[in-house]
Amino acid sequence: MTLADRLIRYDDLNPCTNAFIDTRSPGSDKKENFTLIGPGVAENPDQHIHISIPHGFNIGGARQPAGCLNSQHSHLTEEFFVIHSGTWAFMSGVNGDDGKVIINEGDIISIPTDIFRGFENVVEGSAYLYAVL
């Protein structure tokens, strides 16, 4: 395997618009999900995995237009997010009302296990973030 086989160019990302059940919910239906390295936590078995070689971790991504909400959810693994572009609101709690932070390009947020979290692009235009599990 060469380095080129392990390269994912941003312009070549292959999105999935139905990776999770929440993509059928109003407000979440415009989200694009990306499974970059490893199978991730997508609920759609047909989602394209850019690099499927086992790594011991997963990296995914989400691209959302302004006002698009990723519904509250939790994981059995810790998850952290790296903001690639835009400004994002992260909300915690089952209903999203336990806490809220606004983060920008280059910022990183770590979410512990079993914490309900959701996030929303709060700027005009499309924004992108990476998720590491």
What is the predicted role of each segment?
Residues 39-47, 58-75:
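Conserved short histidine dyad/triad with adjacent acidic residue
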Residues 47-52, 69-75, 92, 100-102, ...:
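Short histidine-centered beta-strand/loop micro-motifs
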Residues 54-57, 75, 83-85, 104:
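Short connector loops at helix/strand junctions that flank enzyme active sites
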Residues 68-71, 89, 108-109, 113-118:
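Histidine-centered metal-chelating micro-motifs
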Residues 80-82, 107-110, 118, 124-133:
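A short hydrophobic beta-strand segment most commonly corresponding to one strand
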